[in-house]
Curated annotation (Swiss-Prot):
<feature type="transmembrane region" description="Helical">
    <location>
        <begin position="15"/>
        <end position="35"/>
    </location>
</feature>
<feature type="region of interest" description="Disordered">
    <location>
        <begin position="187"/>
        <end position="231"/>
    </location>
</feature>
<comment type="similarity">
    <text>Belongs to the SHO1 family.</text>
</comment>
<keyword id="KW-0812">Transmembrane</keyword>
<dbReference type="GO" id="GO:0030833">
    <property type="term" value="P:regulation of actin filament polymerization"/>
</dbReference>
<feature type="topological domain" description="Cytoplasmic">
    <location>
        <begin position="66"/>
        <end position="70"/>
    </location>
</feature>
<dbReference type="GO" id="GO:0005886">
    <property type="term" value="C:plasma membrane"/>
</dbReference>
<feature type="region of interest" description="Disordered">
    <location>
        <begin position="145"/>
        <end position="173"/>
    </location>
</feature>
<feature type="glycosylation site" description="N-linked (GlcNAc...) asparagine">
    <location>
        <position position="44"/>
    </location>
</feature>
<feature type="topological domain" description="Cytoplasmic">
    <location>
        <begin position="1"/>
        <end position="14"/>
    </location>
</feature>
<keyword id="KW-0346">Stress response</keyword>
<feature type="domain" description="SH3">
    <location>
        <begin position="232"/>
        <end position="291"/>
    </location>
</feature>
<feature type="topological domain" description="Extracellular">
    <location>
        <begin position="36"/>
        <end position="44"/>
    </location>
</feature>
<feature type="topological domain" description="Cytoplasmic">
    <location>
        <begin position="125"/>
        <end position="291"/>
    </location>
</feature>
<dbReference type="InterPro" id="IPR036028">
    <property type="entry name" value="SH3-like_dom_sf"/>
</dbReference>
<keyword id="KW-0325">Glycoprotein</keyword>
<dbReference type="InterPro" id="IPR001452">
    <property type="entry name" value="SH3_domain"/>
</dbReference>
Amino acid sequence: MAKFRPSNILGDPFALMTISISILAWLIAFISSIIADVQTQYPNYSWWAISYMFCVIVGLVTTFGTDTGHVYGVAIVGYLACGLVLTSTSANNLIYGKQASMQAAGAGFILLSMIIILWIFYFGSTPQATHRGFIDSFALNKEQPGDPSYRGSRPMSSTFGARPDTVATNNTPQMYTSAQLGGFETSSPVSGYPGGAPGAERASSAPRFGTPNPSTPGNGEQEVGEVPQPTEYPYRAKAIYSYDANPEDANEISFAKHEILEVSDVSGRWWQARKQNGDTGIAPSNYLILL
């Protein structure tokens, strides 16, 4: 299990605000319920609602502190939905009471219901959702994509989809070296015949090895699959997570959380981006938010 870090809560405005308000609302409901139970007959199921919400708040504090909301999001939403029913029912029966203590308890349950709705909206959405990405962008200590638990839970690698044609993935001619071809170099554009079309003079290709063609780059100068880079980057995006490029793919680009990137095209799931230092490459769009 991930280690509990108080900085995950203190550095996350959303977590700090919702947890603080939920604790305050729970205390209001709890203390007012004690007073109301002494003064008049208090509904027993509201005590169960208070006990249940205590467990939910403790669980949410643990979840925010360990930054494992993306792991247990489905279970959290289920528990919150049950809690919303309990708090809403209690609020409806207490807010209309004649005693001030019962009305105060009802107000506490109303605040709890409002916080639960916010939590359901947050945990019930995927990390790629726009509103969740915006909320997480203010957090200082969110779990990084390089962590094993992060890669195993986020749908980045399994469901993100294939990349569109980019710098080195366009349909460019396949280039081979002379050693790879083993002497079967083609001296003409005709495909399927080593050395050119049938009947062509094979001796005509001999000067190619001694006199380089000025219009053809020398050996070692040809870039495999090279396509001109885009010259305009009209969009600006902010990284909501850090991303480490795949070492096996030279097209990907690494960037840090909160880093500002320039983007040339935002139509696909992989965006052609340029960093402030001039490095260019492709970046996953669900790690970025447009400015």
